[in-house]
């Protein structure tokens, strides 16, 4: 069973997936910082200087806090500002992944086109096969007895 597990892990697809997950996690942090630290402040400035992450609707009359964290401590809230921030994170990440996949597909198509244009050159046959081919050709040219 251990050998099967080693073979499973050593396969290329599993290793590629592991690398993709690790890079994706790190890249997700970059996109989150991009949205939280660069995009959302600009959007907030355009729409009145507010921080979208603190936009919420109280779902009970007991909630009267100015920030989302304090409001959550007081009761149930509908935190649509946090949702908008996460949605923008997702859309940016999905767009970047789409562009990366599109670029990889384009490169694959270019390689496939090149392979179709260049016929595959077979290596020359071994010397003994060449000799046998020459003998066959000479025998074929001899008149029948």
UniProtKB/Swiss-Prot annotation:
GO terms for molecular function: mechanosensitive monoatomic ion channel activity. Coiled coil: none annotated. InterPro entries: Mechanosensitive_channel_CS (IPR019823), MS_channel (IPR001185), MSC/AndL (IPR037673), MscL_channel (IPR036019). The keyword Repeat does not apply. It is found in: Cell inner membrane. PROSITE patterns: MSCL. SUPFAM superfamilies: Gated mechanosensitive channel. Keywords: Cell inner membrane, Cell membrane, Ion channel, Ion transport, Membrane, Transmembrane, Transmembrane helix, Transport. One of its GO terms (cellular component) is plasma membrane. The keyword Phosphoprotein does not apply. The chain crosses the membrane at residues 14-34, 38-58, 81-101. It is a multi-pass membrane protein. Belongs to the MscL family. NCBIfam families: mscL, PRK00567.1-4, PRK13952.1. Channel that opens in response to stretch forces in the membrane lipid bilayer. May participate in the regulation of osmotic pressure changes within the cell. Homopentamer. This is Large-conductance mechanosensitive channel. It comes from Rhizobium etli (strain ATCC 51251 / DSM 11541 / JCM 21823 / NBRC 15573 / CFN 42). The gene is mscL.
């Amino acid at each position: 069973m251990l050998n099967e597990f080693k073979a499973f892990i050593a396969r290329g697809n599993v290793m590629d997936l592991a690398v993709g997950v690790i890079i994706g996690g790190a890249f997700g942090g970059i996109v989150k910082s991009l949205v939280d630290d660069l995009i959302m402040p600009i959007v907030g400035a355009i729409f009145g200087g507010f921080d979208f992450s603190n936009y919420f609707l109280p779902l009970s009359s007991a909630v009267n806090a100015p920030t989302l964290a304090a409001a959550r401590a007081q009761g149930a809230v509908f935190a649509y500002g946090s949702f908008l921030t996460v949605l923008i994170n997702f859309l940016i990440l999905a767009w970047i992944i789409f562009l990366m996949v599109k670029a990889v597909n384009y490169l694959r198509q270019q390689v496939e086109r090149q392979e179709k244009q260049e016929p595959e050159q077979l290596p020359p046959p071994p010397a003994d096969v060449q000799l046998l081919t020459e003998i066959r050709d000479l025998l074929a040219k001899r008149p029948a007895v």
